[in-house]
Amino acid sequence: MSVQTTYSPVNQDEQVHDGLASRHVSCEGAPSDDSPYALSSLDHNPLGINVSFLLCFHAAQPEEGIRVLEDGINQLLKAHPFLAGDVTRPTRLSQRTNTMQIEPDAPESLLKIPMLQIRHHPATSIEELESKRLLPGAEEQEIIRQLAPLPIDMDLSLPQRPVLRFQANIMRDGVILAMTFHHAAMDGAGAARVLGLLADYCRDPAAPSVGVIPDRQLRSQIDRLATGCSPSASRADFSQHYCGLGDWAALLAENWPGFLQARATELVTWRLTIPGFKVQYLKGACNALLQGQTSALAGGTLTPTILSNNDIVSALMAMILRQAGQLAGKSTELSIAVDMRPSFHAPAFNNYLGNMVLLTYTPIPAAKDQAPVDGPRPPTELRQEDLEELTGIAARIRQSLLKVDAEYIQGVLSHLHSQTDWANIGFRGVPIPLSSFRNFEMIGLDFGETLGSQPRGFQLHLPVLGGMCFVLPKRQDRTEPWDLHLTLHRDDVSRIANDPLFRWAAGEHF
């Protein structure tokens, strides 16, 4: 992939400072907007890797589209200046160890890695990239190196790393806008919100940004809420779920580039599609069976009465992925990321950009042996025993989600806030982690006519770690297909591809 790199005027240091200066006026008597402030306890849960979201546009005039992006990013930084800052380690002593903070004013970092980079790929098309459904880890990492603004192998132990950067890639048939963010600074929903704000400013440079609550205020509010929570607010033992990565975390921090390089030869990324009509069939069949299974689900008021599409797809992927590698023939565990924003019942947190996620955990039983699918085409319906097991797993997933109420969230916040070493409060890893971006309306964003209005595609790129499953944002397609992004060991691809349940679900779409 041949490239040419240029830098946009939006990256100039004085322009970023203009955005910061506008915030000083409205914060009289408060700490200056360029002073560092602490990340919340929730920000210390995920591994602080770089994650990239890519939006693909069919722009007839890409150079004019770049100008629109420049103006939009300038407006975005005026509303949220911390996005141009860095995530750093505090130099002063505090009551906790291994904490992180945001340093909004980071001119040296901006000079080294501009806010918006522009790269030309005259020999590569969006269509060509989208056609690559199964990628070896090394090729996936090379694509990220070319298209993303921040290095995939940026050392995790660096004392200072950017919160967020953009790169506009001018392809042979359009523009790919890549946004890379530090996972300790925001979660997927926050990143999707940033792209939504950028779309507003690109479509209408005069879009108002009044009433924006400063990021530092919202992050500190989370920890104030945690301080007010009773340690006994929930009966759950959160130490089992928030125990960090232990020695593995130190290993990653010490040799992140080497770790990625080694994993790149072992893993593949797989983008596949489940037709919408199959998900609807499963939802109808499983909900019809649900009433007969409720007696097996202890929990009283937490017994689910209806299963959602997300419940069904999550259970389906758990049943498929339990066939991979060392999981085959064994019971395992599924984790699901849950956005807590709706539970706070505060409008300000609806637009919060930082981390606001917890994980639920669901046991997954070992798979039973199945006969291979005969013939070139899988059956149109699933076997009754498959439907019954799928219903049971989906119901337990829904049951775990129903436990996430106000009391449970208070217990999580209280537990995290009470810890003195925040390197040990990371999420506990499981063999099958799943995150759903299904309701992130990124494909429906309107960036204005210059960029071709709505993106025509979305891609997720992140370090190839293995064992991950993402449900991608819903496409603007009346058939409502379900797109997924998997990371597997290369030896597991054929095993999964020949699994009868996978063959039924994906069919000719993989």
Curated annotation (Swiss-Prot):
This is O-acetyltransferase pyr7. Transmembrane segments: none annotated. Pathway: Secondary metabolite biosynthesis; terpenoid biosynthesis. Belongs to the fumigaclavine B O-acetyltransferase family. It comes from Aspergillus fumigatus (strain ATCC MYA-4609 / CBS 101355 / FGSC A1100 / Af293) (Neosartorya fumigata). The keyword Transferase applies. One of its GO terms (molecular function) is acyltransferase activity, transferring groups other than amino-acyl groups. It is an enzyme of class 2 (transferase).
